[in-house]
Design a protein with these regions (language model features):
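Hydrophobic alpha-helical segments within soluble ligand-binding/sensing domains
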Residues: 1-16, 65-66, 87, 110-115, ...
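Short, solvent-exposed amphipathic alpha-helices that sit
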Residues: 3, 28-49, 64, 89, ...
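Residues that mark the start of a beta-strand
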Residues: 15-18, 103
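Short beta-strand elements in bilobed, periplasmic/extracellular small-molecule ligand-binding domains
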Residues: 17-20, 37-62, 160
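Extracytoplasmic "Venus flytrap"
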Residues: 21-31, 81-85, 133
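Hydrophobic alpha-helical
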Residues: 36, 54-116
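Rossmann-fold dehydrogenase core element
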Residues: 119-130
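Hinge/cleft segment of the Venus flytrap/periplasmic-binding protein
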Residues: 131-175
Length: 175
């Protein structure tokens, strides 16, 4: 959220219109927007004018995200998706219409596709939060072992997240 607000302050004089792509059935994806909205609300209280125009449930699905973004008629500056599949669908929809001005951010991404787009300075894909699948898998594996050994399994797991953009993507992926 802070990366986004700082970017809007620097590039849009603190003003932005945002379309959100959510995954309504995923609790942890919904939580990502709670944190984002807290940061946006604080920025707006401090003089920014960041408006959430609408929220579309992309279901973490590229095609649904593509269709949602293709149907937006009011002007907007940014698309924020909770997962990389939604972001990739948004990028595809924007590029199919030749739109190079709207920027897309993802609150969860990892791998060659999103990192390659950042490395190649894609005109629409701006940044993502690095959600390392290996780290998540390790927590799941450890939790499963603990469960079958009769040990307590944490109900919540926190991992380190890092904002990745074209300035630091090479720290997270080899090209």
């Amino acid at each position: 959220g802070e990366y986004f607000v700082n970017y809007v302050k620097e590039h849009n004089d603190g003003k932005a219109r945002v379309v959100e792509l959510t995954n309504a059935v995923s609790t942890h994806c919904q939580e990502r927007f709670v944190g984002l909205h807290e940061v946006i609300d604080a920025a707006n209280a401090d003089g920014c004018q960041i408006e959430i125009l609408n929220k579309y449930d992309s279901q973490g699905n590229r095609e649904t995200a593509y269709n949602a973004i293709s149907a937006v008629v009011e002007p907007y500056d940014y698309v924020i998706s909770d997962v990389d599949n939604g972001a990739m669908g948004a990028v595809s929809a924007l590029q199919a219409t030749g739109n190079t001005s709207v920027k897309v951010l993802s609150m969860g991404a990892y791998g060659q596709e999103p990192f390659g787009m950042l490395h190649n300075n894609d005109v629409n894909y701006l940044a993502c939060l690095n959600v390392d699948a290996w780290v998540l898998a390790q927590f799941i594996f450890d939790g499963t072992i603990s469960y079958f050994e009769g040990k307590d399994v944490p109900t919540q797991t926190n991992i380190d997240l890092f904002v990745v953009d074209n300035s630091n993507v090479e720290k997270f992926w080899s090209f």
